[in-house]
Amino acid sequence: MIVSASRRSDIPAFYSAWFMEHLRRGEIVVKNPFRPAQEKRVSLKKQDVDAFVFWTRDPRPLMKHLNEIERSGYPYYFLITVTGYPRLLEPSTPRIEEAAIFFEELAGRIGRRRLIWRYDPVIFTAGIAFDFHVNNFSNLAQLLSPFASRVIVSFFDPYPKVERRLLKAGIAVEKAAGSREQQTDLLARFAAVAARSGLEIQSCAEAALTAGVRLGGYARPPVGLGGCARPPVGPGKCVDEELLNELFGLNLAYRKDPSQRKLCLCQQSVDIGSYGNCRHGCLYCYAR
């Protein structure tokens, strides 16, 4: 079993003490996010956990516990989101300069192969256009590529509640700017930056990039999309059993996570977070 901590909330940033308490107990009770009255017990005992995948904006509160996690024998890697957007969109996330520092420290402790940078979501607004993303991504790649092995990019999904929240703040999403053609062009620029920076680049659950891809297993990018021989960025897995096998000598077989979106290629995992308790305050977040 892979434990995801967590798509729903930033456990490393805000609930690392809570996580460690339950890790020591060897068990956690997780509520169904859609039916809170339904609960299930999830074992966190070493013999039941193949690995942890930590999702975060700020790993620093958990970093002081990494020695204990490693002594207990748990494999893990980090997915760390850094977008560098204006504070109106993400008022309480770490500054870019802070992110570069903790990336460097964490890479020095566990190696860059266990650090994955997420540039997610790619959003278009009146003040955040194509050229902003090209320059922003390039600057972030220059800062973070010495300390990360891979970057995962994903475009903004216009959930109604999120669009309402953005509009209330006076921010209109530029949907035309986020067209499939624009996405493909932008990803080509991202791919060139990633190649120069020594970063592997993947997309996350993007219909424009995974049409024709076999979803029952990890596949190569499709051919003939958007007038290109193949898209500039292929589909990837945030929860990646192949990476875990490579890093830790595991023997995990691929099984698509049935609880995720159709186009998501992630390995099946158990998420131990809950919605509505992240304190970063990002206006575009679907988990608020």
Task: Give the ranges of each region predicted by the language model.
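Conserved Radical SAM active-site core
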Residues: 1-89, 96, 100-112
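Active-site beta-loop-alpha junctions enriched in small/polar residues
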Residues: 8-10, 57, 81-85, 120-122, ...
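Flexible glycine/acidic-rich beta-alpha junction loops that bind and position SAM and/or redox cofactors
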Residues: 90, 123-127, 150-175, 205-217, ...
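Conserved C-terminal portion of the radical SAM core fold
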Residues: 98-164, 189-205
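A structural motif corresponding to the C-terminal lobe/cap of the Radical SAM core domain
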Residues: 170-186
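A C-terminal junction/extension of Radical SAM enzymes
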Residues: 181-257, 262
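Local cysteine-cluster metal-coordination motifs and their immediate loop/turn environment
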Residues: 262, 270-288
